[in-house]
UniProtKB/Swiss-Prot annotation:
This is Restriction of telomere capping protein 5. Coiled coil: none annotated. The keyword Magnesium does not apply. Belongs to the RTC5 family. It is found in: Cytoplasm. Residues 322-331 have a biased composition (Polar residues). Residues 147-181, 315-334 are annotated as: Disordered. Its main location: cytoplasm. GO terms for cellular component: cytoplasm. Keywords: Cytoplasm. Residues 348-561 form the TLDc domain. It comes from the Eukaryota. InterPro entries: TLDc_dom.
Length: 629
């Protein structure tokens, strides 16, 4: 398999031997024979070597993955050292605490790819789906306390290899809090599952005890910002797409939006007084607010499983069979189409960096993947910049849309220091309903929950409430009325002829927009489980409830549709909306052509009057009249 000869199970006692055996198991169980062949070719045709040891250093890794580093003067990203330190840590799995940073041998890279592409589920029955603890450890700056340790007799083989393999794993800092008390015991499941069949539990637990007794860790803001900027740039990446297509054209304007979104996301992570991000803050924020943040790493490292040197459709000359081909003369693979479809307007809010930010926490409409991973497209429905600030235009464009929608709002908040720009939004997976003028509050089993969010100046996510107790007609996710405007996450008052009541905020979050679409109020509370939206996962009960008044600059609604390139037997929401508009136009023309002064008993007159009565345009013989939007 390209791995060195394994140690017998009964003789395996050291972390090095057990780590080697686990790599063998990963290689045979988690990759197909073809993937393993491509993997070996990619690794060994590029590997540096000293003696019998073949390994990758930082430059080889960055060049292969096309990740910019400090040596690339043309690219403002500098993520190469960050990715290398992550890989050097993960390559020592499950003994990161004693073996990391590891030399990137083939065995180490096998474990890295399995962990970062989440293929470990094929081998590890008890593996948790998330990789949060491993990713935290790979990013954290680690400082060792001054304690008595046995001397290390001689340097290991890994220490003799090119020092560049570990040079960029920068030393960290120590903090004053107790050591790693935030690592819950159940977070060891991934490593324990990896070793339970290798009779190595005690070895691992010893390694874990060393970690908890010796190390203190925080992720530095500078390190995390560099990784976030890379993830924002490559988030649309699909398997086998060239990474350089996303990293080679980063002009000043693009980098400005990337930095803005990276800072907005960073603001969501509570920071320690001593500096950096603790494990507790990191894990809680990722789990509750940014569940898809690290998804781009999967297609990035899947590049290792396809070698351009192995063109199985053509015979190759043996003389160049071992030469790595980083640059190919073949036609490059086409990039994924933009998630934004052309339509009646171009967005004044969305840009590639904001779309990437959205993909870090918004699911597709079926809830199984993130926004960019399910052939989902955004169709422009309504924009105040294009359609005006009219509720009539809003209802014509939005209430006729038979699919989920994404609402985005950009505006300014008046503060003592001046105006501050804010960007809010709502993910509404169910279509708006014209009968009740509200979005359906009943969710199908396969649908995702709605959510309310803030993108800037600080990332904030108010998740949808899964409780069936709030799925009532008077608590819809979204509500529209000509009298009160647009309401999200509010309680709808009962109809009254004597007074006009407005929807009231309910639960942990709500957004109300006035009838002129010029101002909005954003309510956020750290409590309240009786509404459509729940408190943010990072909020504390000691936080204060806030009400933010916003002057709206832009309001946009985008509809969710499948990729037009994917054939489907069902009509798309775009076709259904066009058919509804055509029907409304025909009915309007028919109404204009009605002659209600026709002779008594005329069937045409009776049909015309019935049509007008049904539409609520005129009253019936009993004096009733009116209608709903």
């Amino acid at each position: 398999m390209g791995l060195s000869q394994s140690t017998e199970l009964g003789q395996a006692s050291s972390p090095e031997e057990l780590s080697h055996m686990l790599a063998e198991r990963f290689a045979t169980k988690c990759f197909t024979p073809l993937e393993l062949t491509h993997f070996k070719d990619n690794f060994f045709t590029r590997a540096a070597g000293q003696g019998d040891v073949k390994y990758w250093n930082e430059k080889i890794l960055s060049d292969f993955l096309a990740i910019p580093d400090s040596s690339d003067a043309e690219c403002p990203l500098d993520a190469g050292p960050v990715i290398f330190r992550m890989v050097s840590y993960l390559g020592a799995f499950p003994f990161q605490n004693t073996l990391a940073p590891s030399v990137l041998t083939f065995e180490a890279m096998v474990k890295v790819v399995v962990l970062l592409t989440e293929r470990y589920g094929k081998v590890l029955r008890r593996a948790r789906k998330d990789r949060i603890r491993l990713l935290f450890g790979s990013l954290a700056d680690v400082g060792r306390k001054d304690i008595d340790q046995p001397a290390n007799d001689g340097n290991s083989k890994e220490d003799k290899v090119d020092s560049s393999a570990t040079k960029s794993h920068a030393p960290g800092f120590s903090v004053d809090e107790p050591t790693n008390d935030d690592y819950e015991d159940d977070d060891d499941d991934l490593a324990l599952a990896a070793l339970e069949s290798l009779d190595a539990i005690e070895v691992f637990r010893h390694d874990s005890r060393i970690d908890k007794a010796v190390y203190e860790a925080r992720i530095s803001i500078a390190t995390f910002r560099r990784l976030l900027m890379l993830l924002l740039v490559i988030s649309p990446l699909r398997p086998l797409e060239p990474v350089k297509a996303y990293t080679s054209d980063l002009n000043e304007g693009r980098m400005r939006t990337v930095r803005q979104q990276a800072d907005n996301i960073l603001a969501a992570f509570p920071q320690e007084e001593s500096g950096g991000i603790s494990y507790r803050a990191f894990a809680k924020t990722i789990e509750t607010s940014l569940p898809y943040l690290f998804d781009p790493l999967t297609p990035l490292f899947e590049h290792l499983l396809f070698s351009r040197n192995l063109n199985l459709s053509q015979k190759r000359d043996r003389s160049d069979s071992t030469d790595p081909t980083d640059q190919t003369s073949e036609t490059p693979l086409p990039l994924s189409a933009s998630i934004m479809l052309p339509g009646s307007f171009e967005s004044a809010i969305l840009n590639p960096s904001i779309v990437s930010h959205l993909s870090f926490f918004l699911p597709s409409t079926n809830g199984s993947k993130n926004l960019l991973r399910d052939n989902l497209r955004l169709h422009p429905i309504f924009s105040t910049a294009a359609h005006g600030s009219s509720l009539t235009s809003f209802s014509h464009n939005v209430l006729t849309w038979q699919s989920g929608t994404l609402l985005l709002l950009e505006g300014a908040v008046a503060e003592p220091s001046g105006e501050q720009m804010v960007t809010l939004g709502a993910y509404l997976p169910q279509p708006w309903k014209t009968g009740s003028s509200a979005q359906s509050s009943r969710l199908s089993e396969t649908s995702a929950l709605p959510c309310l969010f803030q993108l800037s100046p600080k990332h904030l996510l108010l998740p949808g409430n899964p409780s069936s107790s709030i799925q009532n007609p008077d608590t819809p996710a979204a509500y529209f009325s000509n009298h009160s405007g647009i309401s999200l996450g509010c309680r709808i008052p009962p109809a009254s002829r004597s007074q006009r009541l407005v929807p009231s905020p309910l639960g942990a979050g709500s957004l109300t927009i006035d009838t002129s679409l010029e101002t909005a109020e954003f309510h956020v509370a750290p409590f309240g489980h009786n509404g459509v939206f729940l408190p943010a996962g990072t909020s504390s009960t000691s936080d204060n409830a806030t009400k933010t008044h916003i002057d709206i600059y832009n309001l946009e609604l985008w509809g969710f549709v499948p990729d037009p390139g994917v054939s489907s037997s069902e009509k798309s929401a775009i076709e259904l909306q066009k058919a509804k508009w055509d029907f409304e136009a025909r009915e309007a023309e028919r109404r204009r052509s009605l002659n209600i002064k026709a002779g008594a008993g005329d069937s045409a007159m009776e049909g015309a009057r019935w049509l007008l009565e049904t539409a609520g345009i005129i009253g019936d013989s009993h004096g009733r009249g009116g209608g709903s939007v």
